């Protein structure tokens, strides 16, 4: 880490150098903003190296006086972090009041924050999904609800994995993320977490995601994990419910919008996953050799095809050989909204003849996770039938118009 003081035109600016490449230099200024300059246009007044601060873990803490206990499992991510503008480090928030302050959460609930991981979500692997799931299962014996604080980038993967691994749930499980850290005035972390706690205090018997319903404050949606997807890089309402309305909304109280699975008297957690599954985005120019290399040694592959679920005809023989060897090829659509239909055009019919399984209107990432779950849990000869079975609400009978979904009607 380097701290610098530089002159740009008539201004003197100090801060931390966070990137320097391709003739550009990016500085995290003392006011917290990132500023990028053409290297040739700045003059360094001072530049010195400093030891990078350690990445700290959030501390375990329990607060509140409420009768119902909610366990918050911290895995990393923006939701429970703040930026130290003096050092440039991202540090965890260890005091729940920084997230829950200004609400009555701690008078109605007892909140126990427990760290189980401290990773950016893009670094999480299927083994980490199992670890998170086991922690949720352990907490289910004592808590009335479990909230998992998670980075948003891969939250849909992890939450969907838990949705499949939990055959029965004794308490609600709600994932929560944030697009902006808690130190920023525009942070969504506090509202998302407060809503998540309230969602976790219901009789929900499935895995949900708690995120802003719009760019404005005041409304937070609870999305069914297996119908959710991050659809924007930075907006506070980055997550969308694909093809169905949100499960519920929170605007000071919880209101369920559609039918949902209720909690059970017992917990059944089945953690075995087969991670030899791949996901491939078809694109013009993808050749047979590259496709063969991508799917080699994989037990299943989810292909994101064009439109109704197509790929170039010269790749179909590769897929046919792959399925003939006892593996599974699943066709999803790059369009996200709508459903695959391989019976409309000749290419689709050739893919069906090659042994391809349609994902229908499953979200592609969910199809990927479901394949891992089925291969890890059931005899492989059941895979085709089970994949087409609606197990956790991952398949919908019909897609609703986007306008209706946004309105939650």
From Swiss-Prot:
Domain of life (superkingdom): Archaea
Domain Asparaginase/glutaminase: 68-390
Enzyme class: ligase
Residue numbers annotated as active site: 78, 152, 153, 230
EC number: 6.3.5.-
Keyword terms of this UniProt record: ATP-binding, Ligase, Nucleotide-binding, Protein biosynthesis
Database matches in InterPro entries: AsnA_fam, Asp/glu_Ase-like_sf, Asparaginase/glutaminase-like, Asparaginase/glutaminase_AS1, Asparaginase/glutaminase_AS2, Asparaginase_C, GatD, GatD_N_sf
SMART domains with a match to the protein in the record: Asparaginase (SM00870)
An MF annotation (GO) of this entry: ATP binding
Keyword Nucleotide-binding carried by entry: yes
GO annotation, biological process: amino acid metabolic process; regulation of translational fidelity; translation
Quaternary structure annotation from Swiss-Prot or TrEMBL: Heterodimer of GatD and GatE.
Biological function: Allows the formation of correctly charged Gln-tRNA(Gln) through the transamidation of misacylated Glu-tRNA(Gln) in organisms which lack glutaminyl-tRNA synthetase. The reaction takes place in the presence of glutamine and ATP through an activated gamma-phospho-Glu-tRNA(Gln). The GatDE system is specific for glutamate and does not act on aspartate.
HAMAP family hit by this protein: GatD (MF_00586)
Family: Belongs to the asparaginase 1 family. GatD subfamily.
Name of protein: Glutamyl-tRNA(Gln) amidotransferase subunit D
Organism annotation: Thermoplasma acidophilum (strain ATCC 25905 / DSM 1728 / JCM 9062 / NBRC 15155 / AMRC-C165)
Gene: gatD
């Amino acid at each position: 880490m380097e701290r610098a003081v530089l002159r740009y035109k008539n201004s003197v600016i100090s801060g931390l150098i966070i990137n320097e490449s391709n003739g550009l230099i990016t500085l995290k200024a003392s006011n917290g903003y990132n500023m990028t300059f053409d290297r040739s246009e700045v003059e360094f007044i001072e530049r010195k190296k400093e030891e990078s601060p350690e990445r700290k873990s959030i501390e375990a803490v329990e607060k509140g006086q409420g009768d119902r206990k909610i366990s918050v499992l911290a895995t990393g991510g923006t939701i429970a972090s703040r930026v130290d503008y003096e050092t440039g480090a991202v540090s965890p928030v260890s005091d729940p009041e920084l997230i829950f302050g200004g609400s009555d959460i701690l008078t109605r609930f007892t909140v126990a924050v427990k760290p189980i991981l401290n990773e950016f979500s893009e670094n999480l692997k299927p083994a980490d999904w199992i670890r998170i799931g086991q922690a949720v299962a352990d907490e289910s014996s004592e808590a009335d609800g479990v909230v998992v604080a998670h980075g948003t980038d891969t939250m849909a993967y992890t939450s969907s994995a838990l949705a499949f691994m939990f055959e029965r749930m004794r308490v609600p499980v709600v994932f929560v993320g944030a697009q902006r850290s808690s130190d920023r005035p525009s942070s969504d972390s506090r509202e998302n977490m407060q809503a998540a706690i309230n969602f976790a205090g219901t009789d929900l018997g499935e895995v949900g995601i708690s995120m802003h319903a719009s760019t404005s404050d005041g409304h937070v949606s609870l999305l069914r994990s297996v119908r959710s997807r991050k659809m924007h890089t930075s907006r506070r309402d980055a997550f969308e419910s694909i093809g169905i309305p949100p499960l519920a909304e929170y605007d000071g109280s919880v209101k369920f919008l559609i039918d949902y699975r209720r909690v059970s008297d017992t917990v059944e957690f089945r953690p075995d996953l087969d991670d030899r599954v791949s996901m491939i985005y078809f694109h013009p120019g993808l050749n047979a050799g590259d496709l063969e290399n991508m799917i080699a040694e994989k037990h299943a592959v989810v292909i994101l095809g064009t439109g109704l679920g197509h790929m170039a005809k010269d790749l179909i023989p590769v897929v046919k050989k792959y399925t003939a060897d006892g593996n599974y090829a699943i066709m999803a659509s790059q369009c996200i909204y709508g459903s695959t239909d391989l019976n409309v055009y000749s290419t689709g019919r050739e893919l069906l003849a090659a042994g391809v399984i349609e994902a229908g209107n499953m979200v592609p990432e969910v199809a990927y996770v479901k394949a891992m779950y089925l291969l890890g849990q059931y005899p492989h000869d059941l895979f085709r039938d089970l994949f087409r079975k609606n197990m956790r609400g991952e398949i919908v009978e019909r897609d609703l118009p986007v306008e209706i979904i946004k309105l939650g009607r």
